[in-house]
UniProtKB/Swiss-Prot annotation:
This is Lipoprotein signal peptidase. It comes from the Bacteria. Its EC number is 3.4.23.36. The keyword Nucleus does not apply. One of its GO terms (biological process) is proteolysis.
Length: 157
């Protein structure tokens, strides 16, 4: 079934709000003091001033504006590539909802609220639900775009 642009926008907004709301609710619990410690994973509060693995933290306050430009640029690009947007509406809703949630943290808290610390066997960077949703959204998009598209092309041939 082919999705109309209006249906795609509705789905995008729904996924966006679900991811954004879930992430902000979890972060609220963390900010209110929820903690957990175990031999595998800890839930602790950290304010990340950079991006993944604290990269670009030297940009400090200007990083949030750079990220806004990046998100707006990507959204404008997607509106011009409407078939790509319609094909990956859910994935883009996940990425945008998570990305905007992390940007909001920068404005409200001075850094992204991170809290998941995996340390079984090795130390891993502290991350949050939004980070996972960005990874899952991009991963599913890449798998669907490259692997399933190649399969479709073979069927058509």
């Amino acid at each position: 079934m082919l999705k109309t642009t209006q249906t795609s926008l509705f789905i995008f907004i729904g996924v966006f709000l679900l991811i954004f709301g879930t992430d902000q609710a979890i972060k609220y619990a963390i900010l209110e003091g929820f903690r957990y410690e175990s031999s595998i994973i800890d839930i602790v509060l950290v304010f990340n001033k950079g991006v993944a693995f604290s990269l670009l933290s030297f940009l400090e306050g200007s990083l949030k504006y750079l990220q806004i430009l990046l998100i707006l640029g990507l959204f404008i690009f997607l509106m011009r590539q409407i078939e790509l947007f319609k094909a990956h509406t859910i994935e883009f809703g996940m990425v945008f909802g998570a990305g905007v949630s992390n940007i909001l943290d920068r404005f409200v808290h001075g850094g992204v609220v991170d809290y998941v610390y995996y340390h079984y066997g090795f130390d891993f960077a502290i991350f949050n639900f939004a980070d996972v949703m960005i990874d899952v959204g991009v991963g599913v998009l890449l798998i669907r775009q490259f692997f399933f598209k190649q399969k479709q092309n073979k069927i058509k041939a």
